[in-house]
């Protein structure tokens, strides 16, 4: 088990500022629409130990096509509100010798191997306290670059805590690093990353979680479609980073499902709930 430092907001800010510096270094262009749906700017005192938005907590549901999606969502919220989001992260990441201490110091919520009930309860409590919990509801990278089936945890947490779900669709960050395509400085140089923030989704405690989750999936995919429509980079024929249905080289949905099933439940995103 790696060293587990105490939660430290200064460490979180160092991580975010490092990310901002890397964006400036590579001159990455982040293009955002729907910012009016984000929480209002932070109104706490600048030296307050708690960085929370002024309107209460929310679940931030993020699409997952590449390994840097979480980072761009984090930078988006930080730039707009100075909110420090807490992510649900796997036990594997928490146990990693390098990532583990960072997960602990940043105050993220760890989902254990056997059961996620403790993490779920901890996340709901943080939401009630005004924190922003970020979730990748697809529970794994979608190699078809279409939003795949989502777990119900995001909407269930939001309903139990009485907070909205904010859908965040990210397109283009998968070009920088994703499955079978490692980081390339050449691709990152002046790369565009497109983000669309959907309207907050309010889920009542009596609503069907599966139906609400499927609606959330549709909202996230609509955001992706909007991002693709005005993405400032023309893909070549059969570009690997484009969906098959748009002439790209990514696997079709059927091929993606077969590949996920072949890898087993853990690599494919685990047991659906």
Residue ranges and their predicted role:
Residues 1-36, 96-106:
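A transmembrane-helix-recognition feature enriched in membrane-embedded lipid enzymes
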Residues 44-115:
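Catalytic core of membrane glycerolipid acyltransferases/transacylases, capturing the structured
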Residues 121-129, 191-221, 225:
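A charged, well-structured terminal subsegment
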Residues 145-210, 237-244:
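A cross-family acyltransferase "interaction/gating" segment
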